[in-house]
Amino acid sequence: MKAFVCNEFGPIDIHKVEEVAEPELLDGQVLIDVKAAGVSFPEVLIVQGLYQFKPPFPFIPGGEVAGEISKIGNGVEDFKEGDRVIAMTGNGGMAEKVAVFASTLFKLPDSMSFAEGA
């Protein structure tokens, strides 16, 4: 899958879209096919190394996403494949797929677009 990967801190234009492995699910997680990812001010600072939180390299930024659940992990009961959701990912959201704990999900109303949800 493709993801926006940060291998070093610096301006946005030094970072690249790369092929990475699809995330594996842990118990309590779902796999989301990302349709939209939010870009917040902290995200811009994080990739430049200007935020108090500095993740280890390489990392995939993206703390908020909207998309559809494509896979359900063990122990997840409140969601199903195909559900439209909003998730607070912490990181990893700027990818085609992201694994997140179901406890971070909210159902996205049909009246909202994925872009509005992210």
Give the ranges of each region predicted by the language model.
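Extreme N-terminal starter segment of soluble prokaryotic enzymes
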Residues: 1-2
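Residue-level signal for short segments within beta-strands and strand-turn junctions
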Residues: 5-7, 48, 69
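Extracellular beta-rich ligand/substrate-recognition surface
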Residues: 6-14
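Glycine-rich beta-strand-centered segment in the early N-terminal region that forms part
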Residues: 21-38, 50-92, 99
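Cytochrome P450 core scaffold surrounding the K-helix E-X-X-R motif
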Residues: 42-48
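Short, compositionally biased
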Residues: 98-112
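A glycine-rich, Thr/Ser-enriched phosphate-binding loop motif common to dinucleotide/cofactor-binding enzymes
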Residues: 112-118
